[in-house]
């Protein structure tokens, strides 16, 4: 044992001669490893103070201990009864420490053997040996620290950028999050001062001038209301919350939030009072919290003038106060406790009732102060037509259960007309971030620096929120890691594509799926008293108005996206913090311009960090072009897609160099703006001297083949289903939509051959035979896996048939859609029998649980707890200054039917979310940039092959686990008294075939 201790103490970690050289250790050979004796190092430290070894260092302490042992050794030579021989370990230690007494002599001497240590060491010296062992272990640690200090220091970077640049951008980000409303208010006040000084209105766009005209009277009225609240003359329930922000900020928030709601309200120019009041109230509360924190920070940082604190500091302060309160309570100092609690009262959430009361009062003040009149060129010779910009009305809506009335805020037609030009003047919250988001550490810890950020969008579902809060942090680490990976992907605006979008939009839209910027003219009233003609005219007017509402809504949406793109186009890069829906699917927190959006968004966005294409990257660019061009080309083999792109090189160059002046080939694509971006990228690469070394910023997509059915096929080990959705290798991708369309056509052909006298569907089958194609059934197939009902399928197919205009009679159109929907669902059941049985089993389990008045709960493979939020809603009346509002609140009763029907799709969504997050983590570990859109995974062209390998491996890893068995076991543990049906039978499909399937994601 002692031989081991002695040898271990002297050889441990000193064998790494290369590492030791950093500390001045020389190399020589010995049976104990390679080390320059310790005493030399101690002496050397006195001549080289930079080594940082003080008199009290480990080396000095070991040296002193050895000297102590020397004394024992010398004593033993005089007194042989101690039993310490000349060859003992102590002698060896002594020799080892004296070896380099004369530095530079070159003579290292001879180390003594430890062979007799076991016999030589007496038990009374064990403590000394142990102490040396401990000291040497401490010295090892000091070595490591010292070695790290002596390493050449790498330049520090944060988020891939220098510290100076990061700090500059971080300050800008803090300003964006905390001062947006303040800056907007300041801008209005400066414009008002300019008007007063110059005695004329500034040359502003129409909507900006409207905002400016409303701002001053609204601000003054809010200030007057705040004064009444301060003086105690206002006894409204909202009074305690009404003075927590400056009046000018409340005015700007009220105007912008209401206008934002009107812009996204479906083009009707109206918003429900309860929604508007909640929206405005929440914004006021959030801003009040930030304002309060900043005011405290300004006081504490008055000398430095810096703003470096974040909500993390708030959490630390709260923790400090919590501990202080506990100590005071133990000491029975209740008066001091009450004082602290009173100071912290304003930190409490306001509650839904108070939010809507504050929001209603602000809307009411806006209605009382905001007026509008037509522009000068529209005025007649009469008196000016000044009228309220907003009015409060009641709207009646017919439902299946009867009619309901609710309050709405309706804007004047002149305001509505200008709404789609408003986005550029709006304060848009939750903009993309200039620095990487804060890492997720908990339910409300992560994401934006100051703006309220929650890891899950629970929409008021208390049980789901509590489930996430209760789960151990370690269990959620993979989820945190995946969200951080998605949030740390750096993006930028593709300025070339944005320039083309701006040109098309400025010239009226109508190209590349951009909506027409003009409304459809209303049909003129017929000059007749024929009631049938008048009815037809009214029907047409209704249709045109609906079309114009849809156009208006689309215009507002495009304006919001472009407003963000224009604000971000000059940035080197930006980031999208992500969070989850309750099923565990990840979404960017910014709502407008993000990669989950339309073709317009995806065409405008690209990675901020480029990578050389390489040979495989150029090939994947060509495949990607075929994918976004679509029209069936995306269903060819990879070789066929590459050939398509190579056959269209002339069109690609023309599109890239003269997108609007040339042949406009790119406009024929299904995703035109993504096609244009790809054309530009390919043209740049092929025009460069070395295409393989050209830098590409384009995200290349790999999409699942009807991904929901892929998950069901894996769950059920279903061979037939697996082959239909590319879990099995093939020469070209299997197209499940074409497969279902072929089955539907077979059924209809059989029906068409029957006698129409006996079956009314015969004529419908004959009518529809020429209409059956993959496009007719695609949406129904896609959504069937997520629980589409017969009614949903009927409406989807009816919409497709109506677009084709083959059946003009509405009644016949409806009947044909009914027949086609039934036929499509029959074909689906035949092809995906295993999926249907699993869906039924999931639904049955959910029903059993819900019948006991419990929501369905499960834990995803990544450890995320999920609680289905479907509960019956109770109504709660609340009196506000504007009207009596009905607020909806969850009751204790679950919705049995909804719990049952929603469980299969929600469960599969939680699995596809897990697969995406597992892939994201693995890609990050492999050094790949990664972005994910549910079942579409993106990376640089040069890295697609590696990402493809990873995503297949992660899919197999996911389904190697007994997912359904684990689910059933969790149900049985949670509800031991309930009887659940046995698991459905599964097939013998070998999951590892996925690893060899080139078109699994393609």
Swiss-Prot record:
Q: Which residues cross the membrane?
A: none
Report which reactions are catalysed by this protein: RNA(n) + a ribonucleoside 5'-triphosphate = RNA(n+1) + diphosphate
Q: What is its EC number?
A: 2.7.7.6
What would be one Pfam family of this protein?
Answer: RPOL_N
**InterPro entries the record matches:** DNA-dir_RNA_pol_helix_hairp_sf (IPR024075), DNA-dir_Rpol_C_phage-type (IPR046950), DNA-dir_Rpol_phage-type (IPR002092), DNA/RNA_pol_sf (IPR043502), RNA_POL_N_sf (IPR037159), RPOL_N (IPR029262)
Q: Report whether Transcription shows up as a keyword of the record.
A: yes
Q: Which Gene3D superfamilies match?
A: 1.10.287.260, 1.10.287.280, 5' to 3' exonuclease, C-terminal subdomain, DNA-directed RNA polymerase, N-terminal domain
Residue range covered by the transit peptide: 1-21
Q: Which GO terms describe its cellular component?
A: mitochondrial DNA-directed RNA polymerase complex; plastid
Q: What is its main location?
A: mitochondrion
Q: Which family does it belong to?
A: Belongs to the phage and mitochondrial RNA polymerase family.
Q: What does this protein do?
A: DNA-dependent RNA polymerase catalyzes the transcription of DNA into RNA using the four ribonucleoside triphosphates as substrates.
Q: What protein name does the entry list?
A: DNA-directed RNA polymerase 1B, mitochondrial
Species the sequence originates in: Nicotiana tabacum (Common tobacco)
Gene symbol here is RPOT1-TOM
């Amino acid at each position: 044992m002692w031989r081991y201790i002695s040898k271990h103490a002297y050889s441990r970690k000193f064998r790494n001669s290369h590492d030791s050289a950093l500390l001045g250790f020389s190399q020589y050979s010995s049976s104990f490893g390679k080390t320059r004796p310790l005493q030399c190092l101690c002496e050397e430290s006195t001549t080289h103070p930079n080594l940082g070894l003080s008199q009290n260092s480990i080396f000095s302490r070991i040296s002193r201990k050895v000297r102590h042992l020397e004394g024992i050794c010398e004593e033993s030579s005089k007194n042989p009864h101690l039993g310490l021989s000349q060859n003992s370990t102590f002698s060896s230690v002594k020799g080892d420490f004296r070896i380099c007494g004369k530095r530079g002599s070159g003579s290292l001497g001879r180390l003594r053997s430890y062979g007799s240590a076991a016999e030589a060491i007496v038990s009374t010296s064990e403590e000394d040996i142990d102490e040396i062992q401990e000291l040497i272990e401490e010295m090892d640690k000091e070595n490591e620290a010292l070695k790290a200090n002596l390493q050449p220091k790498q330049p520090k970077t944060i988020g891939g950028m220098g510290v100076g640049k990061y700090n500059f951008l971080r300050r800008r980000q803090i300003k964006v999050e905390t001062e947006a409303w303040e800056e907007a208010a300041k801008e209005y006040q400066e414009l008002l001062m300019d008007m007063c000084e110059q005695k004329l209105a500034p040359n502003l766009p129409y909507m900006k001038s409207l905002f400016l005209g409303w701002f001053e009277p609204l601000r003054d009225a809010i200030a007057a209301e705040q004064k009444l609240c301060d003086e105690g003359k206002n006894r409204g329930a909202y009074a305690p919350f009404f003075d927590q922000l400056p009046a000018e900020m409340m005015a700007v928030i009220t105007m912008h939030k209401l206008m934002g709601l009107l812009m996204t309200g479906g083009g009707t120019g109206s918003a429900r009072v309860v929604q508007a009041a909640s929206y405005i109230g929440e914004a006021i509360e959030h801003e009040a919290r930030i304002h309060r924190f900043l005011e405290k920070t300004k006081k504490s940082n008055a000398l430095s003038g810096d703003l470096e604190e974040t909500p993390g500091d708030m959490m630390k302060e709260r923790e400090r106060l919590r501990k202080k309160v506990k100590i005071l309570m133990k000491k029975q100092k209740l008066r001091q406790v009450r004082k602290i609690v009173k100071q912290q009262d304003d930190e409490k959430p306001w509650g839904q009732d108070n939010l809507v009361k504050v929001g209603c009062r602000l809307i009411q003040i806006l209605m009382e102060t905001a007026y509008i009149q037509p522009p000068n060129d529209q005025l007649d010779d009469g008196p000016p037509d000044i009228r309220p910009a907003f009015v409060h009305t009641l709207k009646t809506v017919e439902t299946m259960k009867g009619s309901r009335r609710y309050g709405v805020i309706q804007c004047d037609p002149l305001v509505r007309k200008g709404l789609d030009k408003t986005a550029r003047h709006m304060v848009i919250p939750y903009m993309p971030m200039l620095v990487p988001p804060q890492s997720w550490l908990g339910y409300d810890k992560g994401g934006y620096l100051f703006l309220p950020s929650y890891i899950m969008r629970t929409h008021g579902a208390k049980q789901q929120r509590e489930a996430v809060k209760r789960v151990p942090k370690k269990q959620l680490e993979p989820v945190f890691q995946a969200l951080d990976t998605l949030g740390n992907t750096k993006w930028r605006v593709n300025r070339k594509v944005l320039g083309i979008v701006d040109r098309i939009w400025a010239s009226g839209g109508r190209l590349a799926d951009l909506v027409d910027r003009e409304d459809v003219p209303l049909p003129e009233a017929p000059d007749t008293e024929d009631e049938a003609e008048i009815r037809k005219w009214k029907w047409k007017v209704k249709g045109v108005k609906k079309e114009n509402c849809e156009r208006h809504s689309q215009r507002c949406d495009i304006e919001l996206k472009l407003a963000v793109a224009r604000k971000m186009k000059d940035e080197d890069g930006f980031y999208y913090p992500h969070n989850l829906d309750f099923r565990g699917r990840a979404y960017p927190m910014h709502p407008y311009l993000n990669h989950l959006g339309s073709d317009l968004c995806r065409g405008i966005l690209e990675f901020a960090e480029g990578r050389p294409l390489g040979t495989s990257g150029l090939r994947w660019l060509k495949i990607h072009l075929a994918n976004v061009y679509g029209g069936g080309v995306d269903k060819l083999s990879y070789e066929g897609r590459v050939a398509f792109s190579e056959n269209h090189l002339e069109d690609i160059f023309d599109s890239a160099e003269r997108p609007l002046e040339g042949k406009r080939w790119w406009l024929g694509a299904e995703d035109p703006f993504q096609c244009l971006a790809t054309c530009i990228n390919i043209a740049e690469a092929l025009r460069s001297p070395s295409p393989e070394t050209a830098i590409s910023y384009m995200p290349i997509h790999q999409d699942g083949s009807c991904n929901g059915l892929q998950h069901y096929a894996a769950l059920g080990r279903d061979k037939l289903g697996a082959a239909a959705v590319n879990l099995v290798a093939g020469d070209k991708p299997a197209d499940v939509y074409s497969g279902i369309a072929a089955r539907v056509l077979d059924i209809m052909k059989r029906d068409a051959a029957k006698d129409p006298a006996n079956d009314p569907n015969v004529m419908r089958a004959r009518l529809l035979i020429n209409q059956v194609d993959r496009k007719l059934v695609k949406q129904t197939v896609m959504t069937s896996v997520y629980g589409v009902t017969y009614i949903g399928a009927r409406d989807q197919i009816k919409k497709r048939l109506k677009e084709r205009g083959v059946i003009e009679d509405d009644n016949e159109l409806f009947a044909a859609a009914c027949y086609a929907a039934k036929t499509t669902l029959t074909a689906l059941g035949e092809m995906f029998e295993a999926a249907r049985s699993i869906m039924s089993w999931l639904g049955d389990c959910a029903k059993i649980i819900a019948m006991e008045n419990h929501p369905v709960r499960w834990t995803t493979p990544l450890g995320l707890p999920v609680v289905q939020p479907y509960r019956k809603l109770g109504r709660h009346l609340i009196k506000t200054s504007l009207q009596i509002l009905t607020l909806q609140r969850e009751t204790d009763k679950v919705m049995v039917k909804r719990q049952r029907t929603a469980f299969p799709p929600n469960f599969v969504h939680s699995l596809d979310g897990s697969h995406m997050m597992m892939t994201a983590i693995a890609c990050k570990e492999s050094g790949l940039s990664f972005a994910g859109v549910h079942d579409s995974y993106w990376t640089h062209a040069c890295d697609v092959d590696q990402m493809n390998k990873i995503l297949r491996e992660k899919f197999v890893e996911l389904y190697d686990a007994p997912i359904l068995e684990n689910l059933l076991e969790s149900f049985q543990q949670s509800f031991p008294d309930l009887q659940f049906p046995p698991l459905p039978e599964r097939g013998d499909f070998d999951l590892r075939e996925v690893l060899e399937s080139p078109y699994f994601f393609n």
